[in-house]
């Protein structure tokens, strides 16, 4: 019982870290803001979080070995198996990254922090994401408990009933000077969050955005 209770806090912290890492992933139920803006709603360092998570995993393993009275030989065998599995996962991940690199060659640096920021700006323009988190006009909601039901919307999305950044009929256009010109809206969003506006926003939208969006929102990034 003492060992079992000792697992409570590290397990909860591990879940919290994994969720925090997902707060910059716009297709996650935990999404808040893109990486370039995430620090505005709380301290955020991917390397520090991943390092802490690795330490927690080692602590949980040690407690589990003691709890189930795993011999030292079996512990070594388990650790070896975990390393082999990790190596296989890394190989699969490398293949997926190679596929993503192919897409990047076709559509620019789509997985960069800037690409993610511009994608978020597009979402703000369409009324999907909430600009107010980045301007601190709205506070981030508290972290849910591990077994709470998944929300219908991520906390970074515009709440029901809230006014969107730009009122439109569901269609935005690529037409300089048009009141619903998407490139202009993206530039306005960047200005509102005090981020320098790139010179090539319209070009990025014309050439890079759709391949990026398809890659991000497809179930698999692999190409036949």
Tell what function each PLM region has.
Residues 1-64:
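Extended amphipathic alpha-helical segments enriched in small hydrophobics
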Residues 62-65, 73-224:
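Terminal accessory regions of large proteins
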